[in-house]
A protein has these predicted regions:
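An alpha-helical repeat/solenoid feature that recognizes helix-turn-helix modules
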Residues: 25-26, 43-72, 85-106, 121-146, ...
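Bacterial N-terminal signal peptides that target proteins for export
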Residues: 1-10
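Bacterial N-terminal signal peptides
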Residues: 9-18
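N-terminal signal peptide c-region/cleavage motif recognized by signal peptidases
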Residues: 20-22
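Alpha-helical repeat scaffolds
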Residues: 73-80, 105-113
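Short N-terminal segments immediately surrounding and downstream of signal-peptide cleavage
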Residues: 26-39
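Alpha-solenoid HEAT/Armadillo-like helical repeat scaffolds in large eukaryotic proteins
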Residues: 37, 82-83, 115, 154, ...
Length: 284
């Protein structure tokens, strides 16, 4: 009886490990889908649409973070190199993507540093500060003590972060802020990080997915970013979150936005594959 019980316990432990690990087929299918969306000009676009600089940057960053790369990395780099920046976050994404492709980003990083204000804010918002920190850390530049302090002060009473200083906190900005703070060396056990993770956990639904804000319903991107936040703090997001993402994967490898909508598959899949790979931003 003792041997039988020990065998059952062992099998249960193995099953738990298998469920917690990212499914190799799911990850490889998602990566393959992304790689196939590269257009002739080197950029990436949604199916049947022209290349877009922002989507190209997201695809490259998603692939790199998940441990892969575009089919034609040099073409992607050239496309991004020739693309302009409509705003600060475009610049930050371009830095992340070009660095992921092995291109020099010194001039762009200097431009980004020039966007830092005396308060530590980078660009016009909390969101642009988050991605500014991630971009600078990706290329080996210091985040800047003032920027880290600004981001810590921007934490809302709920424990989350918002796009703007006085906005309503949401899961996406909170997850990204946690990853930015971790990349800047903030302890995973700091009060700010722990409060941020608790805020995220309150936005997890019974289906295992996370939602952008209370009442919005679970979606793939919010779930993926929440997983990455937990990964960055070396904590488990929980099997139910991965199971939720698995249910949204389509036969072609892409991910639905939610159970109801299957819009912008390139954009959504770019955000999901790093989470399935259990890797956080910035890409390494």
């Amino acid at each position: 009886m003792g041997v039988r019980r020990a065998t059952i316990v062992l099998l249960a432990a193995v099953a738990a490990l298998l469920l917690a690990a990212p499914a190799p087929a799911a990850l490889s299918d998602g990566i393959r889908y992304l790689r196939l969306q590269q257009n002739g000009d080197g950029g990436f676009g949604e199916p049947g649409e022209r290349s877009d600089p922002s989507l190209t940057a997201w695809a490259v960053v998603g692939l790199k973070t998940a441990g892969s790369s575009p089919r034609r990395p040099e073409a992607a780099a050239e496309y991004l190199h020739e693309s302009g920046d409509r705003n600060v976050t475009d610049l930050e994404l371009r830095i992340l993507a070009l660095d992921a492709l092995g291109r020099g980003t010194g001039i762009l990083a200097d431009r980004l540093r020039a966007k830092r204000q005396r308060s530590g804010r980078i660009g016009p918002s909390v969101n642009s500060t988050i991605w500014g920190i991630l971009a600078l850390r990706a290329v080996g530049r210091p985040a800047g003590k003032a920027s880290v302090r600004y981001l810590l002060r921007a934490q809302r009473p709920s424990g989350g972060w918002a796009w703007t200083p006085n906005g309503a906190a949401d899961s996406n900005d909170t997850a990204a802020a946690i990853q930015a703070l971790r990349s800047a060396g903030v302890s995973r056990n700091s009060r700010a990080i722990v409060r941020g993770l608790r805020f995220l956990r309150r936005l997890q639904n019974r289906d295992g997915g996370f939602e952008l804000a209370r009442g919005r319903g679970s979606d793939a991107q919010s779930t993926a970013w929440a997983i990455q936040a937990f990964v960055s703090t070396r904590r488990a997001a929980g099997r139910s979150a991965f199971a939720y993402l698995a249910r949204l994967q389509r036969r072609n490898g892409s991910y639905r936005y939610s159970r109801t909508y299957a819009t912008t598959p390139l954009w959504v899949t770019s955000h999901v594959v790093p989470a399935v790979a259990k890797r956080a931003y910035p890409p390494k």
